[in-house]
């Protein structure tokens, strides 16, 4: 970059503060403003020496950033993002992109109308591990992908549920956690056209699910299974295995598996399995270890976002991607409730 990209952050909760931290650490990014009506956000902005605004529209008008990160409550994402896009400001919208598919469609339409780019904050796409995994798949190293498996099994402590919304519909592990794994599989394998699912509340007996299992059909014919539970004493979870977030103990196990006609891949260790010669279950396997340079995916995402804002690259996760991931995730709830397969294919 010829000069530091001027970024603002709208919403200074937990994920907003993650973005603020990464922006301040990177020499090619400059934090030029924070918008959030809370006293804590004002205190944070003053401690960092950056302008603070209670109203994000004042920030956009007075600071005129090149790009804005929208990390407000989910229900406000689209209205805030629209305020940015209508001013020609490139926008990173945190996940989930919206509360509903119809709201997400508003963002897709607004982006097209304003001709201003949107990046949706599914940060795992930016992890070098997943970048390399996608390259291996796209190069044909696995042959035709046949099966994909994702495990998101972990244990949230009782205190986590002191906040009432976490015990209510929409606050469970499907929309909070599994959406990451669904987007990751969409990135690696392709679009999801059908979802079947079961869920359970058997452990905690809350209104919201504690466990869900879904079967996915991908557009290119592969099938997938995803399992999520926040009530299991288990190490099989991307957050534990990939080491993206320091607050979780690192576990040297794998959580995602992609199997094809010529080879299979485990993640996050990037072990590629294939046959030495004849392809048969009687033949010996070889295990090829692929290495990548570790990098913080949130930082990688912001660097990519700066390039998007400068119109140098296309968004790695578009507004339509955010919509399609949300649609597939909400379909897990619908399929579990109805007992029927949910069609998530694009209209003909």
Task: Please identify what each model-predicted range represents.
Residues 1, 67-69, 135, 267-268, ...:
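C-terminal helix-rich "cap/oligomerization" subdomain common to oxidoreductases
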Residues 19, 37, 50-110:
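Beta-loop-alpha module in the N-terminal Rossmann-like domain of NAD(P)-dependent dehydrogenases
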Residues 117, 124-216, 339:
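Predominantly a Rossmann-like dinucleotide-binding segment in NAD(P)-dependent oxidoreductases
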Residues 205-209, 219-300:
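NAD(P)-dinucleotide binding in Rossmann-like oxidoreductases
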């Amino acid at each position: 970059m010829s000069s530091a990209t001027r970024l603002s952050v709208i919403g200074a909760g937990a994920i907003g503060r993650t973005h603020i931290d990464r922006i301040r650490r990177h020499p090619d990014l400059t934090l030029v403003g924070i918008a959030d009506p809370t006293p804590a956000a004002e205190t944070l902005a003053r401690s960092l020496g950056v302008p603070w605004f209670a109203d994000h529209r004042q920030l956009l008008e007075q600071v005129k950033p090149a790009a804005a990160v929208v990390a407000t409550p989910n229900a406000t994402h689209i209205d805030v993002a629209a305020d940015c896009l209508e001013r020609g400001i490139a926008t990173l919208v945190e996940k989930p992109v919206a509360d509903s598919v119809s709201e997400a469609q508003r963002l897709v339409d607004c982006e097209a109308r304003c001709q201003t780019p949107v990046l949706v904050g599914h940060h795992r796409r930016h992890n070098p591990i997943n970048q390399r995994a996608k390259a291996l798949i796209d190069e044909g190293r696995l042959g035709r992908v046949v099966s994909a498996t994702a495990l998101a099994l972990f244990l949230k402590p009782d205190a986590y549920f002191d906040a009432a919304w976490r015990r209510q519909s929409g606050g469970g592990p499907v929309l909070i956690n599994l959406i990451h794994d669904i987007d990751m599989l969409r990135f690696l394998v392709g679009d999801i056209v059908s979802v079947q699912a079961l869920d359970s509340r058997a452990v905690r007996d809350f209104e919201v699910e504690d466990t869900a299992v879904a079967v996915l059909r991908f557009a290119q014919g592969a099938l997938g299974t995803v399992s999520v539970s926040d009530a299991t004493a288990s190490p099989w979870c991307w957050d534990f295995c990939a080491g993206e977030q320091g607050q979780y103990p690192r576990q040297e196990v794998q959580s995602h598996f992609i199997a094809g006609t010529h080879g299979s891949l485990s993640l996050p260790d990037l072990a590629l399995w294939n046959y030495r010669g004849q392809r048969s279950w009687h033949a010996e396997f070889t295990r090829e270890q692929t290495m990548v340079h570790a990098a913080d995916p949130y930082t990688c995402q912001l660097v990519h976002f700066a390039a998007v804002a400068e119109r140098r690259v296309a968004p790695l996760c578009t507004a339509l991607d955010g919509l399609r991931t949300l649609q597939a995730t909400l379909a897990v709830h619908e399929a579990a409730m109805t007992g029927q397969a949910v069609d998530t294919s694009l209209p003909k």
